[in-house]
């Protein structure tokens, strides 16, 4: 798929298709008005006849419009002009791309990037158009015997920008959008892989491959023997019921002019399958527990995008790979684990395993003396109850870092909402036998999970992203979303300086 930007008049475009917007009720966008004038009112006559109202997502494909050089014109319903917001814009782009791909328009010039989207500039509109296009065209069918094929798929897309001065901004937006989309695709692919393929060793192989592909990335894999030497007893306990070895993949990206500059650390929960262990989950939808490694998948995707963008940062990405299975060797409710930090944890529920893996990973990264640490995990069902499937949960021990991540979430459209972490919630983790319990009861489950992790992140600025509600979708079109890759990459773009962003 080839992307480019240009600045030109619609009547001069010689392409398979021109894409322009129509607002409710049957109001032509400025670009559509130009085409209508050139075609002697042909388009407006169709609208008066009622062929298109302009409601969001409506499509009308026109052939051989009078006096127009392009073969086709696609009219796209954009809703009410003053109500065109971020979500609607992205939905319109996705529907447009699907229509172009299905109708044999192998190339197109898209003028939707000239629409006014409240509070957003050309950079944002072009980048989101690229990301939405890639998202719309994504498929995961490698395990199907008969793969459906599009006869004449969309291969080339040109986004028009209002002025020539904005061409460089548009080109940067395409570069960023493609890099982020590459990371999102990598994350989706990892998440969608079946758990009999994507085990901890598979995660490690992907981390090694990333190092093979980019000179700026090195990877080392820590297996169970080394974990024992490091004292990662909590991490090891979670995986001891599985015949698949637990593996923690450590990817180091060196892009900063000073190789010794303090790194940003990203940690991803990589439970490649979570049965719940002895505290076995219900069988209904248990297949979706292959997505319990989507935190690690998003960190992997962010590292890939980072390497493609070649940002001037030092970043460490940790994939905390593990599998939680029931067996005679599994850890049990009632066990007391000594973590790498020396703190002890009473296990009350073996299905609250992600925090037992992450706590040792959080201790491990102290050796980097990090600038900050962000962990990502599909950690709690409570986050789905609190925030649904639209917004990531965010907790942090450092206000400036939390504000940075919230800002990045707003910029990228991959939204997050900060939850509190006051001392009262910590009391729910009290145990009569150990330093803490691994669960704090039903009330405030996302917050108490964050409070648990915070006890292992006292030596640096830390934030936790709970993506349990956003990492995948269920139902007939189930699959990984690749979130929060774009949030993480936007955070890294912002950290790399204004010249890297807009």
Curated annotation (Swiss-Prot):
One GO CC term on file: cytoplasm
Cellular localisation: Cytoplasm
Requisite cofactors: Mn(2+)
The reaction(s) this protein catalyses: Release of an N-terminal amino acid, Xaa-|-Yaa-, in which Xaa is preferably Leu, but may be other amino acids including Pro although not Arg or Lys, and Yaa may be Pro. Amino acid amides and methyl esters are also readily hydrolyzed, but rates on arylamides are exceedingly low; Release of an N-terminal amino acid, preferentially leucine, but not glutamic or aspartic acids
Any Gene Ontology biological process: proteolysis
EC number: 3.4.11.1, 3.4.11.10
Protein name as catalogued: Probable cytosol aminopeptidase
UniProt-annotated catalytic positions: 281, 355
Binding residues annotated for Mn(2+) 2, in chain numbering: 269, 274, 292, 353
Encoding gene per record: pepA
Positions with a binding annotation for Mn(2+) 1: 274, 351, 353
Cofactor note: Binds 2 manganese ions per subunit.
GO molecular function: manganese ion binding; metalloaminopeptidase activity
Function: Presumably involved in the processing and regular turnover of intracellular proteins. Catalyzes the removal of unsubstituted N-terminal amino acids from various peptides.
High-level lineage: Bacteria, Pseudomonadati, Pseudomonadota, Gammaproteobacteria, Vibrionales
